[in-house]
């Protein structure tokens, strides 16, 4: 039997990290067992669904490296098929027309609220006669189609993550609405629970992996599967992603769309790596830094936790920094080069850009950190007070003059790392100046402060961009 899993997002907003993690778990399991990962766009909410959100979801999946195996299916293309199965449920007596008005439903809910009862339809039109139906239609009433749910029934299934789950029919909110309102004997547009069952059966889905907030939907859908004599898939319900307070992660807590994570400077490999461990506790993992291929080889749905997974910026940032540190240098320089381009900064050469990328990568958590870390190499930083104070209290002006004179008199040309060390050593011996004073003075001239990246490697870059001498001269004039 071919194993088939699917992601079924609604295109009513930007690609959310919760949906992305669901996609990842489906994709990983498909990879692990040699199955297929499919996409179905559930766009039957016509008011909120937008094509740009569909594109955003598909682009986000590609960015994360989660490629699907077949052409994505649009639920809206299959409305006529959904209606055919609703008609079948009507004909076999598993569903019926309900003419309850919105006002009547509101009154019912108010009564239940006063009594402290949960909202639940009273199924008042389940046994209407043909004459009563004709009367409602002649009055111009619209009807929805409701699926009969036996309150005494117990629905149970074996969940691959949670084990046996049981649900009572009386807790499902009354008979289930399958379609929107329509006039006469028409059938309105199909709703979520019916469309999902029909489409999963049509796509031959064998495994449904989705969030725990769908558990009650699964109970309802199992009844529809059985009424239509469809084969049940295997169900797995993943834990929710939580905020620091243990509540479901929302836009109010932090950024949640994949676009935002990308724009902040997270690498797709790092975000996928982090999401995989967000609720998944593998027994055989030897490291927290694993590629998608490595993860797929050890991935088991049974290793996913039941409890909610708290989102940790600290952990995500650490993982992202590890990916930046281990990134191939040419690729890294090209990646952060896009940030330089946006700033209007032009490296003197590709070799120079690679050297700068190597120099700053250990100080980067996000890709956009390249802007602050690179800025002193493209723009003249102001001399900070701490820098001026150091130069004044340690005769830094003399140290800088000694370095400047050496560079000019010796006509040193390009200063590489070895040459930089040689210059500092020679000046220190010739003029009896501590090497630490010379290097700190030079750091102030280059960076405007006493902090910054490795000085010797930086000097090589400033020399190649022909700005080392000019920066020393600028600093001398300012003190």
Swiss-Prot record:
Report which superkingdom the organism of origin falls in.
Answer: Bacteria
One Pfam family from the record = Anticodon_2
The name under which this protein is listed is Glutamate--tRNA ligase
Q: Which GO terms describe its biological process?
A: glutamyl-tRNA aminoacylation
| The reaction(s) this protein catalyses | tRNA(Glu) + L-glutamate + ATP = L-glutamyl-tRNA(Glu) + AMP + diphosphate
Per UniProt, where does ATP bind? Answer: 251
The catalytic activity of this protein is classed by the Enzyme Commission as: 6.1.1.17
Question: Family assignment?
Answer: Belongs to the class-I aminoacyl-tRNA synthetase family. Glutamate--tRNA ligase type 1 subfamily.
Motif 'HIGH' region covers 9-19
Q: Which InterPro entries match?
A: aa-tRNA-synth_I_cd-bd, aa-tRNA-synth_I_codon-bd_sub2, aa-tRNA-synth_I_CS, aa_tRNA-synth_I_cd-bd_sf, Glu-tRNA-ligase_bac/mito, Glu-tRNA-synth_I_codon-bd_sub1, Glu/Gln-tRNA-synth, Glu/Gln-tRNA-synth_Ib_cat-dom
């Amino acid at each position: 039997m071919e194993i088939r899993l699917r992601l079924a997002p609604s295109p009513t907003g930007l690609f959310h990290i919760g949906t992305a993690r669901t996609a990842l778990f489906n994709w990983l399991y498909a990879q692990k067992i040699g199955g297929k990962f499919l996409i179905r766009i559930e766009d039957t909410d016509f008011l909120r669904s937008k094509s740009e959100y569909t594109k955003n979801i598909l682009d986000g999946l590609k960015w994360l490296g989660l490629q699907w195996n077949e052409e994505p299916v649009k639920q809206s293309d299959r409305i006529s098929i959904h209606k055919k199965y609703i008609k079948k449920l009507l004909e076999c007596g598993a569903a019926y027309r309900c003419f309850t008005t919105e006002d009547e439903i509101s009154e019912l809910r108010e009564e239940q609220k006063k009594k402290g009862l949960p909202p639940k339809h009273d199924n008042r039109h389940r046994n209407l006669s043909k004459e009563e139906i004709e009367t409602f239609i002649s009055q111009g009433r619209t009807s929805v189609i409701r699926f009969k749910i036996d309150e005494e029934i117990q629905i149970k299934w074996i969940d691959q993550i949670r084990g046996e789950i049981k649900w009572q029919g009386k807790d499902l909110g009354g008979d289930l609405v399958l379609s929107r309102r329509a006039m006469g004997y028409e059938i309105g547009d199909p709703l979520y629970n019916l469309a999902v069952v029909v489409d999963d059966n049509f796509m031959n889905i064998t495994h449904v992996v989705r969030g725990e907030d769908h558990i009650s939907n699964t109970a309802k859908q199992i009844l529809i599967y059985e009424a239509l004599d469809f084969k049940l898939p295997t169900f797995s319900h993943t834990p929710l992603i939580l905020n620091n307070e243990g509540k479901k992660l929302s836009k109010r807590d932090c950024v949640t769309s994949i676009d935002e994570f990308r724009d902040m400077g997270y690498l797709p490999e790092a975000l996928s790596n982090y999401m995989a461990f967000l609720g998944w506790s593998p027994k055989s993992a030897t490291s927290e830094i694993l590629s998608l291929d490595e993860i797929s080889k050890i991935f088991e749905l049974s290793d996913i936790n039941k409890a909610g997974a708290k989102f940790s910026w600290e952990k995500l940032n650490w993982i992202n920094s590890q990916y930046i540190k281990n990134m191939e240098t040419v690729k890294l320089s090209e990646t952060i080069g896009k940030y330089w381009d946006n700033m209007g900064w032009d490296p003197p050469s590709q070799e120079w850009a690679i050297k700068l990328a190597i120099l700053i990568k250990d100080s980067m958590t996000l890709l956009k950190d390249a802007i602050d870390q690179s800025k002193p190499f493209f723009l003249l930083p102001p001399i900070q007070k701490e820098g001026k104070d150091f130069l004044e209290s340690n005769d830094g002006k003399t140290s800088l003059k000694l370095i400047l004179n050496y560079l000019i008199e010796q006509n040193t040309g390009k200063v590489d790392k070895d040459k930089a060390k040689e210059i500092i050593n020679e000046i220190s011996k010739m003029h009896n100046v501590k090497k630490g004073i010379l290097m700190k003075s030079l750091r102030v001239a280059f960076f405007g402060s006493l902090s910054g990246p490795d000085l010797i490697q930086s000097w090589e870059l400033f020399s190649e961009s022909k700005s080392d001498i000019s920066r020393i001269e600028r600093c001398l004039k300012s003190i």
